[in-house]
Amino acid sequence: DFKSYILGILFYRYISENITNYINRGEWDSGNSGFDYADLDDSVAEDAREEMVGVKGFFILPSQLFCNVCKRCDKDDNLNETLEKIFTAIEASAKGTDSEDDFKGLFADLDVNSNKLGATVVKRNEKLVKLLRGIQQMQLGNYQDNTIDAFGDAYEYLMSMYASSAGKSGGEY
């Protein structure tokens, strides 16, 4: 019964890469070829918050990006809390904007403190590390460089797989 975890974390990876690629391309087009948003200090990135929420509808600090959370996930004794704070921050970044309804409750089904993940925090975090690593290893490429939407295809495939295993048809997830 991990569909909400898999789909939620897959979406988290997607929006992390989406905002990173958008910011990186802007910097690269301006001649800053060595720039990588993922390496930027959070305090510097804060300067772009309002603009990014206006353009993308949400904001994610560099330390909150999927790639950076994955780098340190197996060393984070409070990974469940880290993820909960990140998901709350992503939803909160859209509050009071046109995209608020799109992000409100987006990660509500992704309960990182659920006993479904394990009886103890240590067990839950072990499971979360496995989920993050599994999604990190998915070869989805850069969605902007492809005519095939690998993220969308993976998401759609998983949704239909979960629907069929639940005895539902395609549109009844």
Residue ranges and their predicted role:
Residues 1-173:
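Non-catalytic, mostly N-terminal accessory regions of nucleic-acid modification and defense proteins
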